[in-house]
Amino acid sequence: MRFANTLRRGAVLSVALALLTCVTACGKTAAQKQREEAVALTSLGEKYVKEKVRDPASAQFRNQFIGKGGAPCGEVNAKDAFGAYIGFQRYISVARELTLLAQDVAPADFEESWRELCR
């Protein structure tokens, strides 16, 4: 009898967890899931860009969007070694090791990457 009660409680708990999971995950529309994914990718892109600028705490972002294949693209402005903002420049962040700032590569190379990944 004791085993049956334990088994019954376990089954009830399993059903409750399954319902809760379905309510939280299944209740979202495709658009909501897409927005959440875009926010997560944008945040990750900001993190990787901040690792590349001289003063990460000063980084300001604008015109951000998710490009082709899920690459976060946008513009960043940050302070240089003298404490002055350098002006907004475009960035592409495919991964930590594949984050490009416009100032770090030849203009023609950056433009080609921007066309392929961001437009």
Can you annotate each of these PLM segments?
Residues 1-24:
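Sec-dependent bacterial lipoprotein signal peptides
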